[in-house]
């Protein structure tokens, strides 16, 4: 296309996108395939004048500019600074979040608090399948499990996330030159049944107030597109914390077979060591060597400092129920950061669904054993399913 044809195409593309976005149901945003469906719907108007490959090339070049120009809400941005105003100051809001009473994590009070709220980690089930919704209702109605307060020493995906989330935060801080602080489970200021637990919020002057959501991938592909449940989780977190921006960070760490392989990999700088300890034979303690300090002498000195911290005369001894377990040698294989803006339009349309479900839960709590009719029929995979219907749903006025 010559310059005039490109300008005409862009103008037509803008008109098509703006028109389609105005007609679209806001609840379409949480669908994983939102951007793909939007592109396909827009292409229908151009399929008689150009090939799909030509259309895709130009569309991908200008789509983010069009959204920014028309102040449309995009599901996510690969470039995390596209819509962030670094001059805004959220110090007052951050202090408010710090001052909100929050039970300590993993305590009985923490579990009780979470059971009394819809939280970011499970609220996606309301927007998935009927079975997933029933599972959420069952979780809120069922009596607490006798094992709910116990930790374990499994090496499953949950513990993998606990092990590598602090490292992901360290890399995020390093790459963005910021400071991230942890927060507990925060209740919504006005909606009493909603709460959220952000992985972190930037508290340094640079990027002040930006939220961070971490996912440590074990095996799935990192596509730079937040899955449905993650998108909903971030929207609830931004709503609860009243902050407009969230960076969605996905990392994939690999572990060396042994110490020897770690030191042989001389040219990889994004690697390091974790000293793993066990407390009371029930939970892990992770101590992270500083980033980029991988000389053998420095790692040995770090191990000695860990033994001294826990009063361990040697790694084979135990003190106050704490003992050395092993050293993990890791390397960062993939780091991905995607910017997700707060979508108040989506939340305003999603809130009635949340309230309807919570009202039902409150009604069922008055009935003995009401949880049994919501009990999942099998223990098959609980992986959330994306809706089968396309997300571009037109609102008929």
Feature names for model-found ranges:
Residues 1-397:
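Accessory terminal regions of nucleic-acid processing enzymes
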């Amino acid at each position: 296309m010559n310059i005039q044809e490109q300008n005409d195409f862009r103008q037509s593309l803008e008109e098509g996108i703006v028109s389609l976005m105005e007609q679209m149901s806001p609840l379409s945003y949480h669908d994983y395939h939102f951007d793909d469906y939007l592109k396909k719907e827009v292409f229908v108007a151009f399929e008689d004048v150009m090939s799909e490959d030509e259309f895709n090339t130009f569309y991908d070049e200008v789509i983010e500019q069009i959204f920014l120009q028309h102040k449309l809400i995009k599901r996510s941005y690969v470039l995390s600074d596209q819509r962030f105003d670094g001059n805004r100051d959220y110090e007052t809001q951050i202090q408010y979040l710090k001052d909100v009473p929050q039970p300590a994590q993993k305590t009985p009070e923490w579990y009780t608090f979470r059971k009394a709220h819809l939280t970011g980690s499970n609220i996606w089930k309301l927007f998935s399948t009927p079975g997933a919704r029933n599972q959420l209702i069952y979780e809120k109605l069922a009596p607490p499990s006798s094992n709910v307060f116990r930790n374990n020493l499994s090496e499953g995906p949950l513990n993998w996330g606990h092990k590598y989330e602090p490292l992901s935060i360290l890399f995020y801080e390093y790459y963005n030159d910021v400071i991230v602080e942890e927060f507990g489970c925060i209740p919504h200021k006005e909606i009493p049944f909603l709460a959220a637990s952000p992985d972190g919020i930037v508290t340094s002057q640079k990027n002040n107030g930006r939220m961070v959501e971490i996912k440590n991938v074990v095996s799935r592909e990192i596509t730079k597109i937040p899955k449905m449940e993650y998108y909903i989780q971030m929207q609830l977190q931004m709503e609860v914390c009243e902050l407009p921006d969230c960076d969605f960070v996905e990392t994939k760490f690999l572990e060396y077979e042994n110490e020897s392989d770690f030191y042989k990999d001389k040219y990889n700088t994004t690697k390091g060591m974790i000293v793993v300890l066990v407390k009371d034979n029930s939970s892990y303690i992770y101590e992270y060597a500083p980033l980029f300090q991988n000389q053998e002498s420095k790692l040995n000195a770090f191990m000695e400092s860990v033994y001294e911290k826990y009063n361990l005369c040697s790694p084979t001894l135990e003190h106050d129920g704490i003992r050395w377990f092993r050293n993990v040698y890791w390397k960062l294989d993939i780091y991905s950061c995607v910017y997700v803006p707060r979508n108040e339009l989506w939340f305003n349309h999603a809130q009635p669904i949340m309230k309807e479900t919570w009202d039902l839960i409150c009604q069922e709590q008055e009935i003995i054993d009401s949880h049994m009719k919501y009990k999942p029929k099998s223990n098959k995979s609980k992986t959330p399913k994306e809706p089968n219907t396309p997300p571009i749903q037109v609102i008929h006025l």
